[in-house]
């Protein structure tokens, strides 16, 4: 049940937990009381998919509190800048009071090969057919300034069960703010009987200014209200 306090400042490194907590003994990573710690990707090389600032892969019983997760940029298609990526068989994961912002892919919305721009503030993707991502709580977080292209700011997809998304604020993002979806192209080999997010609660979230108005080459008006 260890707690790691991060002092005020910017941390220019990927956060990739390698150990899990236990029932009743959560591992916690949080800003020191009264201070703000930033997981800052300004100087990091972002390439491909899953190369998020915070990567939670096959981890159990861990929580993140009051962190700023920000500044992940790229300008290539087939690259997905991500603030938070939760995948594999992770369970009992909490993000509380975090701010995720300035996650951007700045390439053209679609290139000459037909590849589309993509990025995510938070991507939750259950990729194991036998063990879902489970008991996920995302609350009191703020997501903004996301250039997600044709992806969504906050995505739950694949084998994900028993989640709660509550009291968050999502604004000033491209395309859709929050989506609860099937695995589709994100997990194309998943068993269709479990390859979708289910049995969850989404409540009391504020979602606004989700628009492609700045992508004038394809859309000149808002395409989503949330």
Predicted regions and their residues:
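Hydrophobic, well-ordered secondary-structure segments
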Residues: 81, 92, 115-123, 135, ...
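Short, surface-exposed basic-aromatic patches at helix termini and helix-loop junctions that form
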Residues: 20-22, 159-162
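Right-handed parallel beta-helix
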Residues: 26, 32-35, 60-71, 91-104, ...
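Extracellular beta-strand-rich solenoid/capping regions of secreted or surface-exposed proteins
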Residues: 11-28, 38-65, 69-91, 121-130
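Short glycine/acidic-rich loop motifs that flank beta-strands on beta-rich extracellular proteins
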Residues: 11-17, 41-44, 48-52, 73-82, ...
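Residue-level recognition of the GNAT/N-acetyltransferase active site
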Residues: 7, 87, 157
């Amino acid at each position: 049940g260890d707690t790691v306090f991060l002092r005020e400042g910017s941390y220019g490194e990927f956060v990739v937990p390698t150990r899990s907590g236990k029932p009743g003994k959560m591992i916690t990573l949080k800003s020191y009381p009264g201070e703000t710690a930033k997981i800052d990707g300004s100087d990091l090389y972002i390439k491909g998919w899953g190369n998020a600032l915070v990567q939670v892969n096959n981890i159990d019983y861990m929580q993140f509190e009051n962190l700023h997760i920000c500044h992940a940029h790229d300008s290539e298609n087939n690259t997905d800048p991500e603030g938070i990526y939760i995948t594999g068989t992770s369970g009992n994961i909490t993000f509380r009071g975090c701010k995720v912002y300035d996650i951007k892919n700045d390439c053209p919305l679609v290139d000459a090969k037909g590849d589309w721009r993509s990025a995510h503030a938070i991507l939750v993707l259950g990729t194991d057919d036998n063990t879902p991502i489970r008991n996920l709580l995302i609350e009191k977080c703020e997501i903004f300034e996301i250039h997600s292209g044709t992806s969504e700011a906050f995505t739950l997809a694949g084998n994900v069960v028993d989640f709660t998304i509550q009291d968050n604020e999502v604004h000033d993002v491209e395309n859709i703010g929050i989506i609860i979806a099937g695995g589709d192209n994100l997990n194309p080999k998943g068993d269709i009987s479990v390859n979708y997010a289910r049995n969850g609660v989404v409540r009391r979230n504020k979602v606004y200014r989700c628009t492609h108005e700045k992508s004038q080459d394809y859309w000149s008006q808002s395409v989503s209200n949330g």
